[in-house]
Amino acid sequence: MNFSDIIGNEAAKAYIRHIVDTDTIPHALLIHGAPGTGKLSLARAMAQYIHCTNRQNGEPCGVCPSCKQHLTFNHADLFFSFPYVKTQGCRLSDDYITEWKTFLLNNPVEGFQRWLDELDAGNSQPMIYVDESDNILRKMSYVSYS
């Protein structure tokens, strides 16, 4: 995902480019805004920009191994956690990861409501459950041994 693919949010894109280029990325960022403003797209572009080995003109190159992995949601340092409707046998968002990746590939700028429609959530309330919180902590503790 390139920053140029995101409509608007120019100040946010400039800020993200600046903190990545100057190696001053804070330990956490909260990206928020009204529905339909491209928050997830901005986060995806930032992650790809951080990992890109050949940034060009404020954009990820799109062709290095890291960029190719990001474009298919298979980069080792990228993981998703999202609200879902708990069903029998599905305890973590990882249980929905195939559907999530397909959703993002087919609908790169769609909103949360569209994801709920994909899940066929009905009147069920999607949540991030305790098991999911434990899974986030486990994933964040991964270490590469290279």
Which role fits each region the language model picked out?
Residues 2-146:
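Clamp-loader machinery-focused feature within the broader ASCE/P-loop NTPase space
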